[in-house]
């Protein structure tokens, strides 16, 4: 069933894995990709709870678009332990124009399927999603 401006469907596994990340903290991050053959957003990679932000950024392809969610743990200025779920739209400059357009037109609808996103980041190169930027957006 397609449900976005681009006619893109969202695989049920995407929603189920996101719920596991949110409710059970079963994963540190999830990377999603659009399978153009079947016109559907699917799970590309699951990050285990012990994996770091560096592990997450290392698994994003240098020349292909992806969506991702990352469960970011941090300590506030008041010394409180918190976490926020980031939605990251990764569209590197070196990716195909058609791919960038497809990801851009499907993003809002896909994001609505993932109830509980707290912060959104868009990045075209690694510097736009550095740890400093993530920390500043979380606080």
UniProtKB/Swiss-Prot annotation:
Keyword set includes Ligase? no
Keyword Kinase carried by entry: no
Point out the signal peptide segment.
none
**What's in the GO CC field?**
actin cytoskeleton; cytoplasm
Function of the protein: Actin-depolymerizing protein. Severs actin filaments (F-actin) and binds to actin monomers.
* GO annotation terms (biological process): actin filament depolymerization
Q: What is this protein called?
A: Actin-depolymerizing factor 1
* This protein's encoding gene: ADF1
Keyword tags:
Actin-binding
Q: PROSITE patterns recorded for this chain?
A: ADF_H (PS51263)
Tell me the PANTHER family matching this sequence. COFILIN-RELATED (PTHR11913)
Q: Which InterPro entries match?
A: ADF-H (IPR002108), ADF-H/Gelsolin-like_dom_sf (IPR029006), ADF/Cofilin (IPR017904)
The similarity comment for this entry is: Belongs to the actin-binding proteins ADF family.
Q: Which organism is it from?
A: Oryza sativa subsp. japonica
């Amino acid at each position: 069933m397609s449900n976005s401006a681009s006619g893109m469907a969202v695989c049920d596994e995407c929603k189920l894995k996101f719920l596991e990340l949110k409710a059970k903290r079963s994963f540190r991050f999830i990377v999603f990709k659009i399978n153009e053959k079947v016109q559907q957003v699917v799970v590309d990679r699951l990050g285990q709870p012990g994996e770091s932000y560096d592990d997450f950024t290392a698994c994003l392809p240098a020349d292909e678009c992806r969506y991702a969610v990352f469960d970011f743990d941090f300590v506030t200025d008041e010394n409180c332990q918190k976490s926020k779920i980031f939605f990251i739209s990764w569209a590197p400059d070196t990716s195909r124009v058609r791919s960038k357009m497809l990801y851009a037109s499907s993003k809002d609808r896909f994001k609505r399927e993932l109830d509980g996103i707290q912060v959104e980041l868009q990045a075209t190169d690694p510097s736009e999603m550095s740890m400093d930027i993530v920390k500043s957006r979380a606080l």
